[in-house]
């Protein structure tokens, strides 16, 4: 991956975001398993061709700094411990932020947006925590609980005072107990994902299966019933036919809101090689 600096940012910032690590051949990290197969394979194949501007990676510095600060704390835990387990013809790896051996708890530090907390959108964190738990279990240790401590980078005191569903503090803790059923389910997921990645690696770029809608962060198109002077929709409709049935008043109108693949359009570094993205651009 090559880091550009089109906005002429200080070199220290550029250097700080040029430390992105890449999986070794035959290895898949816990976070890699959470990505789409297409993205994972294309990233590996085109790693040396990918261009990312330093300005697009600033939040990466916050995450790295957060981990460094808490890694330096002295307590009775393993920190930044690396685990590796053979799966099929590959290895699944994970570097755990902190593992409390006495209480059998994994702690992972995150930087996150307030929106994630409001939406309670923690499915990816839970799956990541379970992969770590599975790795640790396979290495002879036990995990009773996973705890994610998130620093909310866009927290507003004013919104915390005035909005009922807004997190009251700029820190949020998400945790869950790890059960035997959880570990059995995540093992099935890991084995299936690794085998799927191994097969995908034998395909040409244009033959790769596109990432799922969930992996592409897809939002469907909508038709919004709007009123002049009002920012939010009165009601959203899934089809133009539904919206056409609305009896509009004088100051009302229907607004079409196209769907989008937010990750593909804004955050995927290998989209120029992606068969689905190429097809959508051509259309």
Show which residues each predicted segment covers.
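Metal-dependent nuclease catalytic regions and adjoining charged, substrate-binding loops involved
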Residues: 1-7, 135-283
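Residue-level recognition of conserved beta-strand positions in structured domain cores
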Residues: 108-111, 150
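Metal-dependent nuclease catalytic cores that hydrolyze phosphodiester bonds in DNA/RNA
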Residues: 1-106, 113-126, 137, 158-167, ...
